[in-house]
Structure formats: structure tokens, C-alpha cells
Regions:
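Acidic/polar loop-and-plug regions of large Gram-negative outer-membrane beta-barrel proteins
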Residues: 307-311, 324-393, 406-438, 477, ...
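Surface-exposed extracellular loop regions of Gram-negative outer-membrane beta-barrel proteins
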Residues: 346-360, 468-477, 559, 563-606, ...
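Structural signature of Gram-negative outer-membrane beta-barrels, strongest in the C-terminal barrel
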Residues: 328, 438, 456-461, 465-467, ...
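Membrane-embedded beta-barrel scaffold of Gram-negative outer-membrane proteins
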Residues: 389-393, 399-405, 409-415, 598-655, ...
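Gram-negative outer-membrane beta-barrel transporters
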Residues: 522, 622-626, 639-724, 792-794
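Outer-membrane beta-barrel translocator/receptor signature
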Residues: 229-232, 242-323, 329-335, 384, ...
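Conserved C-terminal beta-signal and adjacent last beta-strands/turns
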Residues: 460, 574, 605, 687-795
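Acidic, small-polar-rich N-terminal luminal/periplasmic segments of exported/outer-membrane proteins
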Residues: 53, 58, 73, 119-267, ...
Length: 795
């Protein structure tokens, strides 16, 4: 077994970041004007605390007064006292001024009674101004989506949740989801950039694009790559989330990602961004947002993107086009939204993973200087999608909601695998045409009720989900050729198929019913979530000449989460989650291609600490996740034992010093195979699971030049095994990025210029050996040095 990779290059920056004392964000005092607020429904104490903080006023109250009480939240423009009155409706409490900028709460007097003065204590601090949802530094949002539990502040969440803002996405010049997750130490991209598709790993387990939710709905977003210009927020939840969002279509258990769609803000948005990437990628992005009608209740947000040109690799080009329209209505009791989108992505010469036959040594990535995919290979993906959502407040304590989404995807590939047969880099080119059509229909309905029993507050959630997906695969095979990884040969484009693949038709229906109750104790300082989801997995797969395969499995998955806010700055949390996952399907490269395996259970136990110092937050968590493992033997995919990943995570984000922002962390991972066939691989490390991942990104606003920001990022990924026998190993790697941006105004136009260089040292390395269960093993090659330049004009 190998020794642990060195952590030395990252130790000092991380220790310095941990040692930085938070500097409180400045508040602004109430000036008597109405301001815009968006306070989520939940416990009354939390709602009042947040509102007072955003309004920049002081509120003092006896904790016993608000314990166990709930609030329907607040959304719109309000004055300070008007906002307090709305939050307090039905609570039996009243607001009383206590001096300039200060207030207290008293019980509503009964008729003929005298009010008793209580001894108050302060429960609120500084306000955060207009960007209330953004944590200090603006890169991470305080609130994130938790599916049926709604949106919550990260300090009140019994999970490891990080939500990246659209501001962070823009400043990273992120084009797809792979660019955003590069900032997270627990997440890695596991397929080549500008390949046929994007895939990821979270906590050492694979995450498919099809398991990325869109406003809480699975299966709506494009299957193979997701453009980021549509995203208002990117929520990354570590660990299984079956209770929260239902069954993930492809069974990702290491974590989940939710893309929150953009909405029109109170201020008009009109932005155009011109983009350029090295080797000729040119493009533009338009972002327009407006609100209309009485109280600006109607909103429209449009994002359109077009980018095309050559990439960093020879004979490779990429074109992406997307258009997403978001409409919304916000009234006193009703909130509606509709999102419609179209995305197209064409790649010529897409890179492939590099597989190795048994006994072949891992090649040196530095010796690869050319694109080893044939120039006639291509990937064509077209997705049309939409989602409709609605919420209605039946009363101040009861809300019902519903959402429905749909997508149609059409995909066409001409590709070949890259499987090395010797140490000299020889591989057989086996061209294959592959067509796939997907249709998804998904829906959820639910209700949320706030009430109290004695001194205990309750937030009760009931949710019913259904996901229905059909897909049809077809294809053809062509005559083989021979090429070399280090000296690729250009072969003739295939014309006449030598064999046709049997068409397959598969339908998956995932349905579930979930009930959860979040109980609040001790003045909302302790939040206990108890829940369970009754799940059903139905799979029906057919292929001409083969017997139909059908599965209909049911299971109940319990969940528990607890948060103890020992102080406003410190939260302790723990959770236990289970999930039922649709079984793996043998890939087209397997001898038993198309075979569908039975659904399986996964389990997670996690505990952690969250420390919010005002302008810097650090989280530390330990976790253990167990799930069945699969392996390929003599060309056949088979289930084999269990994979157990346990680890330690550190996350850091914020602005510890004025004008200095950090974003990063580390993950130590012990990924072990157990109960394998005949015990042959027991105790070995799982495929593609590095011992150590570490990230550190820093931004510095130069005080000498107003508007100028310098950026830097370092990424470390430990060594990884390519095979379960642990005989083939890819070395650890580091990547360094540098950048700058300059914001200024020209008349009435706001201008932001951005420039960055990814992989400054232009190092070649094997970025990942992680592959999903049921997929042929392979290595992902790094992307060469990449220049990104953009100019954003705000009118």
C-alpha cells in the first residue's frame, strides 16, 4: 500500500485561514424607507433574528416567548415595523419600541389585562444589507435547498451543504458544472473536459449529470453537460439525500447537486458578456431580467449563450448553445414560476477515458501530446426542458406546493474506446455509432405545516414524488483499426457497419412518499429532524430476442438529523440517512450489456461542527457511507461485495480580512472494499478514491487600485487506483490557477473585465480514475493550460 500524499503545500494556507478572526460585517441603520426582504418560513425566532439583522436594528426578547412558535416568512418590500408585524401575525406577540433602532417583544395583552414586562435578552446582531443571502465575500450563500425541507441557513442544517452563488460562478468564468465544482475539495470531475459528457465524484462515489436536480426536480436538466449561465445558485449536499429529494435516477449516493434557476430581481438586469477561451473559443452571453405589474409581482429572466471554436486539443472543436426563460409571479399568498430551456452541445474529436488491460502499466501523462480520439468522432446532444412550480399559503402556518418537470433529449455519437493492450500505448480502435432518445416526466406535491405542542415547535413536511423516464438505445459497429496513445494514427472514417446493435427500450418509474418533522427545542437552539421515505423502484427493460427484465422493489428509508446551536456562532450536527437506489445497468461495452440489476440500499452516518466567526466559516465533518460494489469479470458486469467510504472533511469560506476572500478545504478519505468474491480484494482501496483532496482559492482586492482583484487557486488530488486489485495506480497531482478582474464604470455602464489561466504550469496528469459502477475503468487526462477572458457590460 502507498504512503499518504504530502499535504505540506496546503498546510500553511489552511492553518492561516483557520486562525483568521472574523470581522463583523457592517450594518446599516433603518432610515425609514421600505426595503426588499425574503425571509423563509420556519421558526419564529430564526425569522425575527434574520429580519432584524437585515434591517440593521436591535431586537431583544425573552427566548421563552418565541420558543415553539413559527412564522410564514416574508417576501417583498416592507418598512421595519411593518415587516415585524407581518412576521408576528398569529403569534400572540406584539412589537414594542425600546429606543432608537431598538425593539422588544411582549405578549399580546388580553382584553382587560395588564401587560407584564419581561426581562429581554438580545438575540440579533449585525445586518447584512441588500445581499442578505450571501455570506461574507459573496461566494457562498447562507441558504441552500434541502428538497422537501425547503431552504435553510447552513448553520441550521444537519448536513454538509455548500451553496455557491451566481457571483462566484461569474467570477470563475464557469461554463459548465465541472468548472463550478472544481472549488469543492469533496468533488472531482471524472471525465475529460470537452469529452462526450461530464461526470463527477462526491466523497469518492460517482455522480451522474442526470442526478443533478433543477429547483429540486431530478431529470429535468440536460443529461451530458449543464451550462452554468442559467444558475442562480449551485447547492452541493454531501451524502445520500433520499429523504430530501427522493430517489436519484442513477443512484448517486456520495452526494447531490441542485441548480437553482435564476429569477428576476427587484432591480432590472441587462448584461452582455463577451467570452474568449484559448485556441479560438469565442462566444457571448445575454442576461436580461425585469419585473412588471402592481408591486412588481410578475418577473421575467432570460439567459442566452452561444460559444464555439477550437479547444486546447488538436482536431477538437466545441459548440454550445443554450436559452433559458424564467417567468415568475409573487403575490401575498401565491408564488408561481415557469422555466423553459433548450441546450445544444456539439463536440468534434471528444476525448475518451484511457483504459488499461491487466498487467499494463499506467502511462506517463506527460508523454501524451496529441488528441488520441479520431478526428471523425463526434458527440451531438440536444435537450429541451421545462419546469412549473407553485406554492400557496392556505394560512399563516400551512403551505401547499407542487412542481412538475419534463425533458426530451436526443443524442448521437460516433466514438471509439481507448483500451491499451501494452506498455507502448497500442490500442484497438473499435468505432461505434450510438443513438439515444430520452423522455422524462417528473412531479412532486407536498405540504408544510408550522405548529407547536407546548414548548416544542414543529415544521411538518409531507411530500409525494414520481419520476418517469423512458429511453431507447440503438447503434452500429464498424471495422477495427489500430492506433497509439503517444503517436495517434489517423484512420479512415467508417462508412459501412459490420454489425447493428439490438435496440433496447427501458422505462424506470421511481415513486415515493415522505414524511418529516423538524422539532425545535430550547428556543430553537436544538433542531431535530425525524423522517422516513417509502420508496418504490419499477424498471422494465426489453430487447429483441432477449427476455424482458423487470424489477419492482419497495423499501422504507428512515432518516434522522439533529443540530444543536450551542451559540449563534457554533453548531454541532449529526445525521443518519438511508436510500434505495435503482440497480446498475451493464454498459454497452459489457458482454451482458443492458442487464439491469436489482435495487440496493445505501447508508450514511455523519457528524460535524460548524463555526461561523462572522466573516469566516469553517466546518469539520466525519462520515461513513456504505453501498454495494460492482466489478467486471471476463467482460461481464457483476455485483461484488461492498464499498465503504469513511472520511474527514474541512470546508472554509468567507472574507476573514477586508478585501481578502478564501474558499477551500480538504477531504481525507478511506475507501475500502469489503466482502468481495472469495475475499480476493478485501481491504483494498476502491477505484478512483484518493486519500487526500485539498483546495484553496484566494481573492485579494488591491487597495491601491479600486475595482482590481487578483485571484489564485491551488488544487491537490491524491493518488488513485484504477483496478480493485490495486495493481495499477495513477500518481497524485496539483493544479494552479491565476486570474484577475477589474470592475469600473463608463458613464451609466458597469464594466467588469476578467482574465484567468487554468493549469498555469501546463502540467499533464491523470486527473481521475473514478468511474461509475457498471462502467469500464479508465483514466481521465487533464486539460492543458487554458486562457479565459471575458468582458461583462451592465446597462
Amino acid at each position: 500500500m502507498s504512503s499518504s500524499p504530502s499535504f505540506r503545500p496546503f498546510a500553511m494556507p489552511l492553518l492561516l485561514a483557520l486562525g483568521c478572526a472574523g470581522l463583523a460585517a457592517p450594518s446599516w441603520a433603518d432610515d425609514g424607507t421600505r426595503r426588499s426582504y425574503e425571509i423563509p418560513a420556519g421558526s419564529l425566532g430564526a425569522a425575527l433574528t434574520r429580519f432584524a439583522g437585515e434591517a440593521g436594528v436591535s431586537l431583544s426578547v425573552d427566548p421563552a416567548l418565541v420558543s415553539g412558535r413559527s412564522s410564514a416568512g416574508l417576501n417583498g418590500d416592507f418598512g421595519v415595523e411593518e415587516g415585524f408585524a407581518r412576521l408576528l401575525q398569529g403569534s400572540g406577540l406584539m412589537l414594542q419600541p425600546a429606543g432608537e433602532g431598538s425593539y422588544t417583544l411582549l405578549p399580546m395583552p388580553e382584553e382587560g389585562s395588564r401587560v407584564q414586562q419581561l426581562q429581554p435578552i438580545a438575540i440579533t446582531g449585525q445586518g447584512s444589507g441588500a445581499a442578505a443571502d450571501h455570506y461574507a465575500g459573496g461566494q457562498v450563500s447562507r441558504r441552500g435547498g434541502l428538497g422537501m425541507l425547503g431552504e435553510r441557513d447552513f448553520m441550521e442544517t444537519p448536513f454538509n451543504l455548500t451553496s455557491y452563488t451566481s457571483e462566484a460562478v461569474k467570477n470563475q468564468q464557469a461554463r459548465t458544472l465541472a468548472d463550478v465544482v472544481a472549488s469543492d475539495p469533496s468533488v472531482r470531475t471524472t471525465n475529460p473536459s470537452a469529452g462526450r459528457f461530464e461526470q463527477f465524484s462526491i466523497r469518492g462515489y460517482s455522480l451522474y449529470n442526470s442526478d443533478v436536480a433543477y429547483g429540486g426536480l431530478y431529470g429535468v436538466l440536460p443529461t451530458y453537460s449543464i451550462d452554468m449561465e442559467m444558475a442562480e445558485r449551485v447547492d452541493i449536499l454531501k451524502g445520500p439525500g433520499a429523504l430530501l429529494g427522493g430517489l436519484a435516477p442513477n443512484g448517486s449516493v456520495g452526494g447531490s447537486v441542485n441548480i437553482e434557476p435564476k429569477r428576476a430581481g427587484d432591480e432590472p438586469t441587462t448584461e452582455f458578456t463577451a467570452m474568449h477561451a484559448s485556441s479560438g473559443q469565442l462566444g457571448g452571453h445575454v442576461d436580461i431580467g425585469r419585473r412588471f405589474g402592481d408591486d412588481q409581482r410578475f418577473g421575467l429572466r432570460f439567459n442566452g449563450v452561444k460559444q464555439s471554436g477550437d479547444t486546447e486539443w488538436d482536431h477538437q472543436s466545441l459548440e454550445r448553445d443554450s436559452a433559458v426563460l424564467g417567468l415568475d409571479l409573487r403575490a401575498e399568498r401565491v408564488r408561481l414560476s415557469l422555466d423553459l430551456g433548450r441546450q445544444e452541445r456539439d463536440v468534434d474529436g471528444p476525448m475518451e477515458r484511457v483504459g488499461l488491460n491487466a498487467g499494463v502499466k499506467v502511462p506517463d501523462a506527460e508523454d501524451i501530446h496529441h488528441n488520441f480520439a479520431q478526428p471523425w468522432t463526434y458527440s451531438r446532444a440536444k435537450d429541451t426542458f421545462g419546469a412549473l412550480r407553485g406554492e400557496y399559503d392556505l394560512s399563516e402556518s400551512l403551505m401547499v406546493y407542487a412542481a412538475a418537470g419534463a425533458r426530451r433529449g436526443d443524442y448521437d455519437f460516433l466514438r471509439h474506446a481507448v483500451q491499451l493492450t501494452n506498455d507502448a500505448g497500442r490500442f484497438v480502435v473499435s468505432p461505434r455509432a450510438f443513438q439515444r432518445e430520452e423522455e422524462v416526466r417528473t412531479a412532486t406535491v407536498g405540504l408544510r405545516n408550522w405548529f407547536s405542542t407546548g414548548s416544542v415547535g414543529h415544521t411538518l413536511n409531507l411530500s409525494l414524488n414520481r419520476f418517469d423516464m423512458t429511453f431507447d438505445n440503438s447503434g452500429a459497429r464498424y471495422a477495427n483499426g489500430v492506433s497509439n496513445l503517444f503517436d495517434p494514427a489517423t484512420l479512415p472514417e467508417p462508412v459501412t457497419p459490420t454489425a447493428a446493435d439490438n435496440p433496447t427500450h427501458t422505462r424506470s418509474v421511481l415513486s415515493s412518499l415522505a414524511l418529516a418533522d423538524t422539532l425545535s427545542f430550547a428556543g430553537d437552539s436544538v433542531l431535530l429532524t425525524l423522517g422516513a421515505r417509502l420508496q418504490r423502484v419499477e424498471v422494465d427493460s426489453s430487447e429483441p430476442g432477449e427476455p424482458d427484465q423487470r424489477y419492482d422493489e419497495r423499501a422504507t428509508s428512515p432518516a434522522l438529523g439533529v443540530v444543536w446551536r450551542t451559540t449563534e456562532a457554533l453548531s454541532l450536527y449529526a445525521n443518519y440517512m438511508e436510500g434505495l437506489t435503482q440497480g446498475q445497468t451493464a454498459p454497452e461495452t459489457a458482454s451482458n450489456a443492458g442487464q439491469v440489476f436489482a435495487p440496493y440500499r445505501s447508508k450514511q452516518v455523519e457528524a460535524g461542527i460548524k463555526y461561523d466567526m462572522g466573516n469566516l466559516t469553517s466546518t469539520l465533518s466525519v462520515f461513513r457511507i456504505e453501498k454495494p460494489a460492482y466489478y467486471t469479470e471476463n467482460g461481464y458486469l457483476r455485483p461484488d461485495g461492498e464499498q465503504r467510504n469513511q472520511g474527514l472533511e474541512l470546508n472554509l469560506f468567507g472574507e476573514p480580512l477586508g478585501g481578502v476572500r478564501i474558499l477551500g478545504g480538504a477531504m481525507l478519505l478511506d475507501a475500502e472494499l469489503t466482502r468481495t468474491a472469495n475475499g480476493s480484494n478485501d481491504g483494498n482501496r476502491a477505484i478512483g478514491a484518493p486519500i487526500l483532496n485539498a483546495n484553496l482559492g484566494v481573492e485579494w482586492d488591491l487597495p491601491q487600485v479600486q475595482g482590481l482583484t487578483l485571484t489564485a487557486r491551488a488544487i491537490h488530488t491524491g493518488a488513485q487506483y484504477l483496478d480493485p486489485a490495486n495493481t495499477q495506480k495513477a500518481a497524485a497531482w496539483q493544479r494552479y490557477d491565476l486570474g484577475a478582474r477589474y470592475a469600473f464604470s463608463v458613464g451609466e455602464t458597469d464594466v467588469t473585465l476578467r482574465a484567468s489561466v487554468e493549469n498555469v504550469m501546463d502540467k499533464a496528469y491523470w486527473a481521475s480514475a473514478n468511474v461509475p459502477d457498471g462502467t469500464a475503468t479508465g483514466l481521465t487526462l487533464s486539460t492543458p493550460r487554458t486562457w479565459l477572458v471575458s468582458a461583462t457590460l451592465g446597462f
